[in-house]
Amino acid sequence: MSRYRGPRLRIVRRLGDLPGLTRKSARRAYPPGQHGQNRRKRSEYAIRLEEKQKLLYNYGVCERQLLRYVKKARRAGGSTGKVLLELLEMRLDNTVFRLGMAPTIPSARQLVNHGHVTVNGKVVSIASYQCKPGEVISVKEKEKSKEMVKTNLQYPGLANIPSHLEFDKNKLVGKVNGIVEREWVALQINELLIVEYYSRQA
């Protein structure tokens, strides 16, 4: 599965709110399409698959990337689901989004890919870069970069910055103070179902 570039609201109506993908919320209680209102009991597999798709669309990763994250989380020990969410949340594109520097993860990824973001004073253009405690995330010293972020700060995707991050709006400088806590993950997700999905695929 490649990265999704189609209508975002259609995905939100099918999977529920995806704060990383779009600020729009599902207005209808049933999925899109001609038979959207016909509610059928879903299989356990369908439920696990849906949870996995939430992660894919919210964080903007492809199937292959997510599988790599799952394998890495397994090797790390502890709760695989918790570590999986930490790996996704600590990506540079998501960190830029959670700092309020971009309204969505796709727009944060664009900022990173185009070289507008620095980590410890050096431009990092890899969206999947894993941010670490103590690192400083800031905007490149160019007027265009600063204006883009200043505009984005007026329309943040989420109201609150997580407790493991801090951001100085005047200096446009953020800092990673630790690893994200589970309670600060904005996406409504059951990560255990995703771990189960991949354990059954193995």
Curated annotation (Swiss-Prot):
KW rRNA-binding (keyword) present: yes
Region feature Disordered, mapped onto this chain: 22-43
Cross-referenced CDD domains, in alphabetical order? S4
Q: Identify the SUPFAM superfamilies for this entry.
A: Alpha-L RNA-binding motif
User: What Pfam families does UniProt report for this protein, alphabetically?
Assistant: Ribosomal_S4, S4
PROSITE patterns given for it?
RIBOSOMAL_S4, S4
Family matches, as InterPro entries: Ribosomal_uS4, Ribosomal_uS4_bac-type, Ribosomal_uS4_CS, Ribosomal_uS4_N, S4_RNA-bd, S4_RNA-bd_sf
Which SMART domains does UniProt cross-reference here?
A: Ribosomal_S4, S4
Query: Which residue ranges does the record assign to the S4 RNA-binding domain?
Result: 90-152
Molecular function GO terms recorded: rRNA binding; structural constituent of ribosome
- Keyword RNA-binding assigned to the entry: answer is yes
Could you list this entry's UniProt keywords, alphabetically sorted.
Ribonucleoprotein, Ribosomal protein, RNA-binding, rRNA-binding
Recorded GO CC terms: small ribosomal subunit
Q: Name one GO biological process term.
A: ribosomal small subunit biogenesis
The free-text function statement in the UniProt record for this protein reads: One of the primary rRNA binding proteins, it binds directly to 16S rRNA where it nucleates assembly of the body of the 30S subunit. With S5 and S12 plays an important role in translational accuracy.
Similarity section? Belongs to the universal ribosomal protein uS4 family.
Assembly and binders: Part of the 30S ribosomal subunit. Contacts protein S5. The interaction surface between S4 and S5 is involved in control of translational fidelity.
What name appears for this protein in its UniProt entry? Answer: Small ribosomal subunit protein uS4
| The encoding gene | rpsD
